[in-house]
């Protein structure tokens, strides 16, 4: 049955479950604007999702659209998409936790030019190792539509060059929503 505390009359889309299973990121479209919300598991029930990440230039949620958020493995960063990025196309951003008790997140930052292109980026998945990001993009050296790429973070916190995962992962069509097991031996698309 529907989880009434999460389902509303608006468009509600789950993005990412925290690695401890206690928090869920959702994006909602209200008044033609998409924003990231978070719900917490209280015992066995999900609390009402709240936009606790702000609504200003110094927050995750801005006057642009923010969607498809997911946690990093340490649950101290979230990665999400915004249409306020380079050339007003969808770009990957991240934000770090500033105050966990009050659920205050820092200003969104671009994942950088090695990841974001002048074309649209899509879904993002952080591998459990915390150093590997899989994402979809229409840019870089896409085979057609969105392809799945991988990038690795260096010791300074910068993402390295995007690498196309190639065939059989990518096709001439849109390839999105990659995830894998912790071992990396099994992937889901």
Positions of PLM-derived features:
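Short, conserved micro-motifs composed of acidic
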Residues: 1-189
């Amino acid at each position: 049955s529907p989880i009434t505390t999460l389902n509303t009359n608006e468009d509600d889309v789950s993005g990412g479950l925290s690695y401890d299973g206690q928090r869920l990121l959702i994006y909602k479209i209200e008044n033609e604007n998409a924003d990231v919300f978070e719900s917490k598991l209280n015992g066995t029930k999900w609390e009402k999702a709240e936009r606790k990440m702000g609504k200003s230039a110094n927050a995750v949620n801005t006057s642009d659209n923010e969607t498809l958020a997911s946690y990093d493995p340490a649950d101290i960063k979230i990665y999400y998409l915004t249409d306020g990025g380079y050339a007003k196309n969808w770009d990957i951003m991240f934000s770090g936790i500033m105050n966990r008790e009050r659920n205050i997140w820092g200003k969104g930052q671009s994942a950088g030019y090695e990841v974001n292109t002048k074309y649209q980026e899509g879904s993002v998945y952080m591998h459990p190792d915390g150093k590997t990001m899989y994402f979809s993009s229409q840019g870089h050296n896409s085979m057609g539509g969105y392809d799945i790429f991988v990038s690795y973070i260096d010791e300074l916190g910068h993402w390295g060059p995007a690498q196309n995962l190639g065939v059989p992962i990518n096709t001439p069509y849109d390839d999105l929503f990659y995830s894998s097991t912790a071992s990396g031996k099994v992937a889901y698309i």
